[in-house]
Structure formats: C-alpha cells, structure tokens
C-alpha cells in the first residue's frame, strides 16, 4: 500500500501547489471537466506565463494536409465492442476526408505532461494536433502558450452545440483555445453483476457503498486528485468548489485510511479499465 500512499502524497502536493486557486480548480464546468485543446507545437503567446516559450519550430500545414493527430484518454469515444470500430470517428473521417490518428495515450494528466513538457518548453512539435486534458491542465497549457487559438469562423458547432455555462470559463474566456469534451461530471463505474453478488444491489448510489467491507480490495480511485478529492469532500458534506484547508485534509485522511486498511486496491489513472475488465476491480 506504500506505493498508493506515495502517489496520493505526490498528487496532493501538486494539487496544493497549483498556481490555480482552489475555487478555479473545481469550478463551473464541474469536478471532472475535460477540455480538448488545440496543440500549438510549443508556440509562445501573450499568456502571462513566467517563462517565455520559444517560438514554434514547426510549420502549420493544416491548410494543405488533411490529417489530424489526436491524443486522448481510453474510453472517451464510442466503440463497437465486437469490431473495435469507432462509429462517430469513422463518420467524421467519411464526411470530411480527414485522416485521423486517434491515440489513447493519456492515462494521467501529470504523466502525459511530463512526457511532452521538454518539447513544449523548447518550442518543438509534440506531433499532436488535438489533446484532451482535464480543465486544470488545459489551463496550464493555455497560460504557458502551448495552445493555438481556434478559428471559430469555420467552427459553427463550437457555439451551436456547447451549453451556455461552458461557453465562457475562467481558464479560457470565450473558449478561444479549448472546447469541452466529456465535461462536467465525476462518476462511479462498477461491474453490476459482481457488485450485486457481493452487496446485494447492482447500483452504486453513494461513497458509503464503496467502503462496504465486502468490497475490500476491489475498489480503485483515480490518481486525478481533483476528481477523487472533489467526490470525497462532497461525500463529507463539504463544497468541493469552495473549501477550507481543514476540510481538504479531512478528505485526505479518509482516503489514506481506506488505502491503509486495504479497502482501496489501487490509485490509478485510466489504466483502471484493465482491472475492471479482468474482474480484479469491481468499482472505481
């Protein structure tokens, strides 16, 4: 369990040291907001970042090349269980003629950022056009000059299909650099049949059920502390968009207790999906 404790400690320190205020971290778009950001190949901009980012060393070929390289999380696109095809993505390719390289290579925000950070800071290409990041990480990229402004004049759906409360967010006023994708919620996931066989119901409705002793060692929580801590604070009756340090530490103590007693099997990024598929984990 020490590995899980260490991960929680690292993520918590990163959370508390974030340049964003607590209110901005968990506001408006919801606990689990995720934004699709147009990667700018490290191009610097007037973003107020502490260190100026070198100018991009790669050429924008979007006018001449009908290709799109997209990095995202596992499970963020509708997929045919039998064939592995992605109907929505296939329809987009057919309609536009754009060749899409769709890569599920984001398991954790910090992990992915560490992989491409040096290239971004040096103004080099990361070989992606579109990256799906949680709101707080999208904010860091935008503020650091790593994102490219969107041309809304050729994106009518950017306004037509986005609800009003997500049209204008604190980290990206006017949505100049990002658009919401799978945004505005933090959820539980579980294996219905296995859950019912252990606790008598196939539905999870509260955190209390996750801590049922019959699920000991079969529960995973996300390494994305903004999701995990937000849900725990709400469970404890506190507002995850406006909380005190004492309330935050109360939630941390609850998490540590459940890790130390073995109730929580692991703290993971989106790699939890493999444990769900194998049956090692029943709920996340």
Locations of the language-model features?
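Flexible hinge/capping segments at coil-to-helix
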Residues: 197-214
